[in-house]
Amino acid sequence: MSVSVRDARVSALDRRWIESVYREYLDDLAPLNTGIFPVLGEVGHREPDQLTRWYADSSARILTICKSAAPVGFAMVLPGRPTPGRSAPDFRMAEFFVARPYRRLGIGQSAVALILDRFAGLWEVQEYLRNPGAVKFWRHVIADYTRGDYEERVANGEVRQTFRSGPSRTRKG
């Protein structure tokens, strides 16, 4: 399996592909009912508007996840934000999505490792406790990538992992 990650900003085809699966991504998030994500079709909330904001943010690293060079997912990496009592991490995973037909094949885990190696530094990943699939995925992927060398905090309905990344990390496998 050949997994790669590329900059989505350089390809109009990648942007169109992300636009084509964005509704599926929001459908995955809808059951969380956090109030953060717009209800599809609501007046004033349109998928293209959300994506336009992503692409307008010069600090956002929008990535296309590929299997054998074909798009199968996307990720968005943003600069970290400080939290009370802690300095800001270098990076945070703001969005991460693998299309349904490509899940549970190891593509997501491989893509995460490529992204973490590409953006070396202090990371934070956050999931909602109401999303047990995401919590399980990120705990597994981060534990494997860091070989258990990460911190996790659970508060206010969120799980946050912080850890260091970089290509010098030795992972199992």
Model feature map: region roles:
Residues 98, 104-117:
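Conserved acetyl-CoA-binding loop-helix of GNAT-fold acetyltransferases
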Residues 124-139, 143, 153-156, 163-164:
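Conserved beta-strand-loop-alpha-helix junction that forms the acyl-donor binding cleft
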Residues 4-31:
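A short beta-loop-alpha structural element at the N-terminal edge
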Residues 148-150:
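Glycine-rich ATP-binding loops of the HATPase_c
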Residues 80-93, 103:
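A conserved beta-turn-beta hairpin within the catalytic core of GNAT-like acetyltransferases
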Residues 62-64, 70-80, 92, 97:
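Conserved beta-strand in the GNAT
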Residues 93-104, 127-129:
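A short, internal acetyl-CoA/4′-phosphopantetheine-binding micro-motif in the GNAT/acyltransferase core
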Residues 36-62:
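Active-site rim helix/loop that mediates acceptor-substrate recognition in acyltransferases
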